[in-house]
Structures are given as structure tokens and as C-alpha cells.
Amino acid sequence: MKCLKDGHMHSHYCPHGTKDSFQMYIERALDVGLDEITFTEHMPLPGIFMDEKLLKECSPNEEEILLYLKEATKIKEEYKDKIKINVGLEVDYVEGYEEKIKKMLDNYGEYLDEGILSVHFLRLDDVYHCLDMSVDEFGIIAKILGGVEKVYDKYFETLIKSINADLGSYKPKRIGHPTLVRIFNEKYPMDYKNEALIDKVIKKI
């Protein structure tokens, strides 16, 4: 029997998401026939490596994430007879902050059923850029690297680094939106041909 699952859901704790309650997400999941869902709110970022105002829009802070984990755990128990709910985090891989990410995962690990590991940030000569922040920012990244194809290369190379990184025993086993680099494909179309690099990513996943 096929199990219908949504393994990447955010919550009202997400600064750039909706304010819909856990109950609204769950009731909608039941309405469309899902058997299992995973809440994967963004884990707090591991440091201030870019504009602080921008970073505050990316994830809950440490106080908020504890509230999220505790509320999600409570909701999971309340609905256990209706739907399987997993409590998780979306862990943003930030190159150079591996040790801090590992420590944070150790702190939150007791609450986690699963998680996803994602790449939103690219480090270019020790300056960080948010890949999916805006079309304009994507264009800046492409200009620095020397073209859109180079952005794809850098993204997939960073994705491989995230998979190889030692993030401890609570490191997520799933990769979030591995084609995120295509987010502005309408503005920056690319028929990406680096099959060798894509094969490396697929083998790692």
C-alpha cells in the first residue's frame, strides 16, 4: 500500500512563511489524503555571516526554535491516531560553520524524528551570498563567478560539501530541494550540461 507523505513543511515560526497554525497544516494534510507529514522548520543559522537584518528573515531564533520543537512534539501526540507526524528541522549548510551546526544539532537532537539538509548560501572568496534571495542577487552571484553555468557548478559543489560534512549523529539524511539553483530559471535560463558533476551529486545522494 502506497504511503502518501509530505516531508518538507514549515510552520508559523518561519519568518518568511505563513502564519497558519499547525492544526491548519494538519487538517489540510488529512483533507488531501496524506498519511504522513514532517514539519521541517529552519534551524537557526550558525552565525552572523551576512547582513543581520536579512538573516533574521531566514529562520527563527534560538528561543523561537525551542518553542517550535516543543509545540510540534505536543501536536504530534495529539494527532497520533489520525496521521503520522514527524518533528524535524531544515538545516541550512553554511560552508565554514560546520562545527557550530554540529553543536546546534546536538542541542536539538532529542526532539528530532528526521530532517533535511539544504544549501541556500554560497561562499565566494569568504563573502556569503543567498542563492534564492532575489533575481538581482542571483545576477550578482553570476557576475562574480563569470556566468550562470558557474553558479550551477558552485551550487552543486557546495551541495556535495554539505553531504560530506561531519555534522554529527543528528545530521539530516535527506537533501532539500537539490535543484534550488533553478529558482530563477525564467530570468536566467540554463541548459546545464555538466553531467559529471550531476552524477557526483546523484551518487552522493
Walk through the language-model features, giving the residues of each:
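Domain-core and long-helix interface of multi-subunit machines
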Residues: 13-15, 111-205
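An N-terminally biased module of ancient metal coordination in phosphate/nucleic-acid-related enzymes
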Residues: 1-95, 99-103, 107, 184-204
